[in-house]
Amino acid sequence: GMFNIRFAMPTRTNGQHSNHLYPNDYFPFTYGESVDPFSGRSDGVLKRSMASGTEPKIMHIQTSNEYWVRGGSLPHTNPEGTEDAVLPNGVRFYTLGGSQHGSGSGLPRPASSGQLAPNPNRWSPLSESLMAAMVRWIAEGAEPPPSRYPRIADGSLVASHNGQEINHDAWNPLPGINHPTAIYQPGVADYGMRWASERIIDTHPQTARGYYNPLVPAVNLDNNDSAETTVLSPLTQVPLATFVPWNLRAVATGAPLSL
C-alpha cells in the first residue's frame, strides 16, 4: 500500500490487471540516489535523512513474488533496469526465494483464485530471525547478515521476457503450466502540479507516460531460486518440487493470463 499521499489507502495496490495508475509505486525507488529517466531528477528514499545525519537502519525483506507482481527489483537497480544500485551502509536487502507474498504454512492447499495451488513455503521463521538480528544491530551494534539478493552484475537478475516470449533464464516452460505473458511494470503519470512537492493529486491520469523496467530472479533448470542469491528456507534449500513465486488468475476468477 501507500501512506504518503493525501487520501492514501494503505491496503490498496496497483498491479498488472487492476488499479492501474493508482500512485503506489513511483520514483524514487532506491534508498541511495538514482536518476529518473523521465524527469531527469536525482533522488533517493533516504536523501533527506542522509543529508541531516538521521538516516535509519533498514532491513528490506521481500519475496521473489514481489519481483513479478510489484516491481521488486527497482529498490536495488536503476529505474531502467540496466545496472545495480549501491545500497547505503545502513541498509540490508534480503530476497526470500521460492516464496509467495505471504508466508505459507508448510502444508499444501488446493488452488482457489489462482491456477496453481498456493505456495506452501513457510518463510516466516526467516523474517523472525532477521528481526532478532535487527534488534542486535540497533541495541548492540552487531552487524546483521550481509545482504542477499539477485543482481544484474552476476546474471542472477534477468528480464522476465524476451519480447513476447518468456525468458528461459526466468522460467523454463513446463507441460500443462501456463506462465505469465507479462509482469507488472510501474508507470509514470501526471498527477498534477502539487504531486511532486505535496503528494496531492489534482489530476487523475488516464494513461501512463512510460514505464520503469523491473527484472526478476534467474532460476535453475527446476525453476527454483538460487541459495547464493536469495535466502531459502529448509523447504526450498532441498526442494522436492518447484516453488513458484507467481500464480496466474484462475479462469473462474477472470483474466487468466494475468498475475
Model regions: which residues?
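C-terminal His-loop and adjacent cap/lid subdomain of alpha/beta-hydrolase
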Residues: 1-259
